[in-house]
Amino acid sequence: MKANELKNATAAELEAKGTELTKELFNVKFQLHTGRLENTSKVSNLRKDIARVKTILREKRG
């Protein structure tokens, strides 16, 4: 996910995207702990995407 794509999104879209990514992170962590996750870098990528969304959302609000 590119930061440029996020900057063009509305605040409501960013909140929805953040919620979606948080749910996906929960599922990926669950797979990691049960031993079913093959691509472990997905956890860190999701965390970075969530941080990007939160940062841009904070910029729009502030």
Swiss-Prot record:
Q: Does the keyword Ribonucleoprotein apply?
A: yes
The signal peptide here is none
Q: Which GO terms describe its molecular function?
A: structural constituent of ribosome
Domain of life (superkingdom): Bacteria
BP term (GO), one: translation
Ordered alphabetically, the record's keywords are: Ribonucleoprotein, Ribosomal protein
What Pfam families does this protein's entry cite? Answer: Ribosomal_L29
- Bilayer-spanning residue ranges: none
Q: Does the keyword Cell wall biogenesis/degradation apply?
A: no
Entry's CDD domains?
Ribosomal_L29_HIP
Listed name of the protein = Large ribosomal subunit protein uL29
- Organism from which the protein derives: Citrifermentans bemidjiense (strain ATCC BAA-1014 / DSM 16622 / JCM 12645 / Bem)
